[in-house]
Regions:
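An N-terminal, well-structured beta->alpha segment
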Residues: 1-63, 88, 137-159
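Gly/Ser/Thr-enriched, mixed-charge loops and adjacent short helices
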Residues: 13, 104-159
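Short acidic, glycine/serine/threonine-rich loops at helix termini
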Residues: 15, 51-54, 81, 100-105
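Short, ordered loop/turn segments at secondary-structure junctions
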Residues: 44, 71-72, 94-95, 111, ...
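Active-site cofactor/substrate anionic-group-binding motifs, chiefly glycine-
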Residues: 62-72
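Conserved phosphate-binding catalytic cores of ATP/NTP-utilizing and phosphoryl-transfer enzymes
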Residues: 70-87
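Short gly/pro/ser/thr-enriched loop/turn and capping motifs at secondary-structure boundaries
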Residues: 73-76, 97-100, 113-114, 121-122
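Active-site microenvironments of hydrolase-like enzyme catalytic domains
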Residues: 91-109
Length: 159
């Protein structure tokens, strides 16, 4: 049985049952297991989304490129992954949950949520994580507007 992952990612109330330690350890564990080199992040407009973005970045080493695409719908993640060649996506959102909640959903390079077996492996690894100090160097990920420009070009071609 999974401790952190629910049906659709990890959800909770930030700084209560969804903590910096949990989120940073999850991303550090993801790096150990999936070995991503480029991570796309999108978020919703909840007050805690930028704080969770910081926590995510603290879990990844400085070898991982983290691109913050800002506020975009969840359905845009597969397009980002395919268009720009990221091999991991993270959506910061709690979907339909009340506004005090937030969470993270991990998306594989094919645009699908991670398989249960991988989530279980990540969870097993979380308890053994000790974040090295080098993992604090990505406090401000790059913002990338290529997706928005590409989307606008595609949209204009269609009309």
């Amino acid at each position: 049985m999974k401790k952190y992952f629910g049906t659709d990612g990890i959800r909770g109330i930030p700084n209560k049952n969804l903590t910096k330690e949990i989120v940073s350890n999850v991303t550090c564990s993801v790096e150990d297991i999936l070995k991503p080199t480029s991570v796309a992040v999108i978020l919703d407009t909840r007050d805690s989304s930028l704080e969770i973005l910081d926590w995510i970045c603290e879990g990844f080493s400085e070898n991982i490129e983290v691109i913050n695409y800002g506020v975009l719908p969840s359905g845009s993640m597969p397009i980002l992954l395919e268009t720009f060649g990221h091999n991991l996506g993270i959506i910061i959102s709690a979907s339909h949950n009340p506004s005090e909640y937030n969470g993270i959903k991990l998306i594989d390079e094919n645009g699908s949520k991670l398989q249960d077996e991988i989530e279980i492996e990540i969870e097993a690894n979380i308890e053994n994580i000790s974040l090295p100090s080098a993992h604090t160097s990505l406090k401000n990920p790059k913002r990338d507007i290529r997706f928005i420009l590409n989307f606008l070009i595609r949209f204009l071609i269609l009309i």
